[in-house]
UniProtKB/Swiss-Prot annotation:
InterPro entries: Ribosomal_uL15 (IPR030878), Ribosomal_uL15/eL18 (IPR021131), Ribosomal_uL15/eL18_sf (IPR036227), Ribosomal_uL15_bac-type (IPR005749), Ribosomal_uL15_CS (IPR001196). Binds to the 23S rRNA. The gene is rplO. HAMAP family: Ribosomal_uL15 (MF_01341). PANTHER family: 50S RIBOSOMAL PROTEIN L15, LARGE RIBOSOMAL SUBUNIT PROTEIN UL15M. Residues 1-45 are annotated as: Disordered. It holds the Pfam family Ribosomal_L27A. Part of the 50S ribosomal subunit. It comes from the Bacteria. This is Large ribosomal subunit protein uL15. GO terms for biological process: translation. Residues 15-28 have a biased composition (Basic and acidic residues). Belongs to the universal ribosomal protein uL15 family.
């Protein structure tokens, strides 16, 4: 016989009613409801992070040091090697061109770093350059202009 969804049944003993505790004193789990007598564990609940009195983990760990500079400027970075790969024919390279090629996100500041080699002359116009990037662009016959 093939198994069908409407023939499926839970295994015997798999389903049992939940035990309702603290309902009258005559039954097995009345009065103290299986919690024993008195003490913290008998009263309401114990915090999930409570470790029995030892120094809790969140107090054993060190506090974070330092601060976050609210005036920090973050740049999208592009290497000279990436420019050489994306623009093999050279020419003008602006932030919009880099966004169009998928090298950086739009509406973000762009910085060119000096990793990689450049063989064609490119006129790069972005927000910032490193010293090595300027040198490599100039050595290839191009210009590096900051916005």
């Amino acid at each position: 016989m093939t198994i069908k969804l409407h023939h499926l049944r839970p295994a015997p003993g798999a389903k049992s009613d939940k035990i309702r505790v603290g309902r009258g004193e005559g039954g097995k789990r009345g009065k103290t409801a299986g919690r024993g007598t008195k003490g913290t564990k008998a009263r309401k609940n114990v915090p999930a992070a409570f470790e029995g009195g030892q120094m809790p983990l969140h107090m054993r760990l060190p506090k974070l040091k330092g601060f976050t500079n609210p005036f920090r400027t973050e740049y999208q970075v592009v290497n000279v090697g990436d420019i050489a790969r994306l623009f093999p024919e050279g020419g003008q390279v602006t932030v919009e061109d880099l966004v169009a090629k998928g090298a950086v996100r739009k509406n973000q500041l762009v910085k060119v770093l000096g990793d990689g080699d450049l063989t064609v002359a490119v006129q790069v116009t972005v927000d910032k350059f490193t010293g090595s990037a300027k040198e490599k662009i100039a050595a290839a016959g191009g210009t590096a202009t900051e916005l």
